[in-house]
């Protein structure tokens, strides 16, 4: 099973919000998913616009899940913010 970490769109028209989910590559974008690992609101500035379970993301990456380009950028931003806080 090919697993990807991708965005799942929610919200209103003109006011998008995204859930970061782990899903089978063959499932539709807004279809069934395995696990929700985060949240992204593009209308809110960082760091409030991102919420990510980094432990679960790293688990899925070790299992072979491939993040999309956008999710990969979000993971890098959040991990940079986490290391800056500590």
Swiss-Prot record:
<dbReference type="GO" id="GO:0015935">
    <property type="term" value="C:small ribosomal subunit"/>
</dbReference>
<dbReference type="GO" id="GO:0006412">
    <property type="term" value="P:translation"/>
</dbReference>
<dbReference type="GO" id="GO:0003735">
    <property type="term" value="F:structural constituent of ribosome"/>
</dbReference>
<dbReference type="InterPro" id="IPR023803">
    <property type="entry name" value="Ribosomal_bS16_dom_sf"/>
</dbReference>
<protein>
    <recommendedName>
        <fullName>Small ribosomal subunit protein bS16</fullName>
    </recommendedName>
</protein>
<keyword id="KW-0689">Ribosomal protein</keyword>
<dbReference type="InterPro" id="IPR000307">
    <property type="entry name" value="Ribosomal_bS16"/>
</dbReference>
<dbReference type="GO" id="GO:0005737">
    <property type="term" value="C:cytoplasm"/>
</dbReference>
<dbReference type="Pfam" id="PF00886">
    <property type="entry name" value="Ribosomal_S16"/>
</dbReference>
<keyword id="KW-0687">Ribonucleoprotein</keyword>
<comment type="similarity">
    <text>Belongs to the bacterial ribosomal protein bS16 family.</text>
</comment>
